[in-house]
Amino acid sequence: MLKMVDGVVLVVDAYEGPMPQTKFVLQKALDLNLSVIVCINKIDRPEARPADVIDETLELMMDLDATDEQLDCPFIYASARGGFAKYKIEDPEADMSPLFETIINHIPAPEGDPDAETQVLISTIDYNEFVGRIGIGRVDN
């Protein structure tokens, strides 16, 4: 599935830190040289420890032989439940714009021919009660 994306937003819990599945997904993303954005989520929890979690995430990246460029990835602080994201922990709570802007600015745009016919590689078929059958895939053109 990671071969179908241009980058990843690695969501890490602000209290628990990187989990075993975090290591697995991050290793695959680094191996594919994907752009990484680290989102420290649940910063609104009283027991959150975002500074420690950032250090743990960077240590994990170093253990996985991340390049200097990969280590220089952006970190975003967020609360999915609260509906806000921040560039810095001390920034005011507003909306998710910092996360979306970071995705736009950091994840490379897909390459394709905008003048060509639409071309989609479907990787998964899903079903939704409201819209019916859904094809999930990567748009190439």
Regions found by a protein language model. Name each.
Residues 1-4, 40-42, 87-89, 100-102:
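Generic detector of short, locally flexible boundary/turn motifs and exposed helical patches
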Residues 1-4, 8, 28, 56, ...:
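Generic, well-ordered alpha-helical scaffold segments in large soluble proteins
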Residues 2-52:
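Conserved Switch II/interswitch segment of TRAFAC-class P-loop GTPases
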Residues 7-11, 32-44, 57-79:
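Conserved beta-strand/loop subsegment of P-loop NTPase cores
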Residues 22, 50-57, 96, 100:
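Amphipathic alpha-helical segments in well-structured domains
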Residues 62-141:
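Conserved catalytic-core segments of large NTP-driven translation/proteostasis enzymes
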